[in-house]
Amino acid sequence: MSIQIPRGTQDILPGTVELWQYIEGQAREICRRYNYKEIRTPIFEHTELFLRGVGDTTDIVQKEMYSFQDRGERSLTLRPEGTAPVVRSYVENKMFGDATQPTKLYYIGQMFRYERPQAGRYRQFVQFGIEAIGSNDPAIDAEVIALAVEFYRGMGLKNIKVVLNSLGDAASRQAHRDALIAHFEPRIGEFCSDCQSRLEKNPLRILDCKKDRNHELMGTAPSITEYLNEDSAVYYEKVQELLTMMDVPFEKDPNLVRGLDYYQHTVFEIMSEAEGFGAITTLSGGGRYNGLVQEIGGPEMPGIGFAMSIERLIMALKAENIELPIEHSIDCYVVALGEKAKDHAAKVAFDLRKAGLSVEKDYLDRKMKAQFKSADRLKAKFVAVLGEDELDKGIINLKDMATGEQEEVALDVFASYVAEKLI
C-alpha cells in the first residue's frame, strides 16, 4: 500500500506554487512599504509559551495544539499561531532596547492546528502576519488594519469588509467580565461543557462559542461597549476616525471578541462577502495585546497585529474569479538534433542560464517534433535549434514562438543576443 499525505495537509505542486510565490512576494512588498521587517521563528516552541501567551481557556490550547515530549522529556508544541513566538523572540532578543520603536515585524510561515479539515481550513496552513510592538498610538491600530485592507485590494478583492470592536483596557474588561458572569451564571447549566468551564476563567469566550451561539441569552448579553471607560472609549473613537481618514470602511460589531485571550482595546476581522463562498467568511483577524509582552517575561510593552490564512485568501480569489498575473513560461528551450549537438546544447543552455534566463533542454533523446511539443507545454518564448549543420556553420537557429519568425545567430554571441531580446 502506498503512503499518502496526512489528513488536513496538502501538496502544493508546480503550476500552483507560483500563485503562492506571487502572494508571498506581494506580502513582502507591502510590508516593505510600511517598514515592517521579516522575522523567522522556530516551527516548534516550548508548550508553556502558548499556555501563557495564547491562553489556557482557548480552543487552540485545549483542543488543537500538536504537542509532544522530546527525548529530553521537554514539552514542545508545533506553533499554532505566530504572535506568541514573535513576542517571545522580541523579549528574548531584547528588541525593546532598540532606539527605533515601535518594532515592526512580519512573518510568513507554517502553522499547525488539529482541526476538522474543511474547505480553506487545514491542519498545516500558512499564515502571513504582522506585529507592531512598542506603541499605544491609535494610529498604529489604524495602520495595521489599513495594511491588511490594502493588501487584499492589491490582490484584486472587492467584496471584503472590516468588522471592528473594542474590548477596552484591563479595567473595562474586568467590569464587562463581572457583568457577563452575572448574566450567564443563573442558566449556565443550559450551555455546553466548554462554556461552563469558561464562566469563571474567561466568560468573554462564551460569546465566541459556536455550539451555543443561538441561545437566547447570547442576544441579551451585556455589550462591552457599555463598559468601556472614558479612556477606552476615546481610544476606540480615535481608531475609527483614523480609518475613515484612510478611506478604510468598517462596521462596528460589539459581539466581536476573537478567539485568543491576549486581546485588549482594538479587535477586528476582515471578511469576504463574495457570492462564491455561499456565506460571509473570515479571511483574517487581529487586535491589540497590551499585556502579552509582560506575560511572556518582558517589560510592559503594548502591541498590535493581525494574521491571515493564505489558503483562505486563495479561496477568496477563486470566489471572485480573480486571475493574478503569474508567469508560467520559460525564456528559451534548446532543441538538440544528433549526438554531436547534445553536448554543445548543454553548453548553450548553461550560457543562457548564466546570462540570467530561464532555460530548459531535452534529456531524453526525443525527436525534434517531440522537443517542440515540450517547448510549447513550457510556454517557451524562444526555441534554439542546434543540429550538426548549425554546428558546422557556427550558428544557432532561433525561433520566436510568439511571431513564428526565425533567424540565424552566431554561436559565440548567442546568449547575450537572446538576453538583449528579452530585456
From Swiss-Prot:
EC number in record: 6.1.1.21
Entry-linked CDD domains: HisRS-like_core, HisRS_anticodon
UniProt GO BP: histidyl-tRNA aminoacylation
Keywords: Aminoacyl-tRNA synthetase, ATP-binding, Cytoplasm, Ligase, Nucleotide-binding, Protein biosynthesis
A GO CC term assigned to this protein in UniProt: cytoplasm
Major localization class: cytoplasm
Coiled-coil regions listed in the entry: none
Reaction equation(s) it catalyzes: tRNA(His) + L-histidine + ATP = L-histidyl-tRNA(His) + AMP + diphosphate + H(+)
Domain of life: Bacteria
Stretch forming the signal peptide: none
Protein location: Cytoplasm
MF term (GO), any: histidine-tRNA ligase activity
PANTHER family named among the record's database cross-references: HISTIDINE--TRNA LIGASE, MITOCHONDRIAL-RELATED, HISTIDYL-TRNA SYNTHETASE
Subunit-structure text: Homodimer.
Family: Belongs to the class-II aminoacyl-tRNA synthetase family.
Protein name in UniProt: Histidine--tRNA ligase 2
Organism: Bacillus cereus (strain ATCC 10987 / NRS 248)
